[in-house]
Swiss-Prot record:
Protein name: Gag polyprotein
Keyword Mitochondrion among record annotations: no
Keywords: Host-virus interaction, Viral budding, Viral budding via the host ESCRT complexes, Viral matrix protein, Viral release from host cell, Virion
Gene: ev-2
Source organism phylogeny: Viruses, Riboviria, Pararnavirae, Artverviricota, Revtraviricetes
Pfam families in UniProt: Retro_M
Organism: Avian endogenous rous-associated virus-0 (EV-2)
InterPro entries, alphabetized: Gag_M, Matrix_HIV/RSV_N, Retrovr_matrix
SUPFAM superfamilies tied to this protein: Retroviral matrix proteins
Keyword flag Signal: no
Residues with site note (Cleavage): 104-105, 115-116, 126-127
Residue numbers spanned by region Disordered: 77-99, 130-166
Composition bias, Basic and acidic residues: 77-90
Amino acid sequence: DPITAALSQRAMVLGKSGELKTWGLVLGALKAAREEQVTSEQAKFWLGLGGGRVSPPGPECIEKPATERRIDKGEEVGETTVQRDAKMAPEETATPKTVGTSCYHCGTAIGCNCATASAPPPPYVGSGLYPSLAGVGEQQGQGGDTPRGAEQPRAEPGHAGLAPGPALTDWARIREELASTGPPVVAM
């Protein structure tokens, strides 16, 4: 991609291989953010490139002026964003509607006594469906056998490995490496 080519050419001309590593981290992190469907603002925050923001950007962080002023026939009229939003909001409120209110026992919709007439379930008596786990901890220290599954290495966070599901990016590790190795990075 053209950004990577330009950065690598600049690093070669200036002779700064550390800069290549830094920008490689940034590009890799942004690619991972794209794959994880993270917004660019959120990725910038995680990388510490948010321009001094303390909290992650979100809908509540969007800066809006407290009042908007407009001039009507020489008069200044102040209108708060709350008043403006109230004007634009639809008047009808959504009421929750219940769908399929019929009884699953008898099929009647109104006047069913099935739920109130049914007896409570019998108490649990330990039917023996599951084997007892008593003594399992005692067996661990004895014998040279490793427990089943212990021989498989676990995948580290942020690295694709044997872990099931999609691997997530370790943003804290990337931010630490950027802070320690890289040149000062200006907010994008």
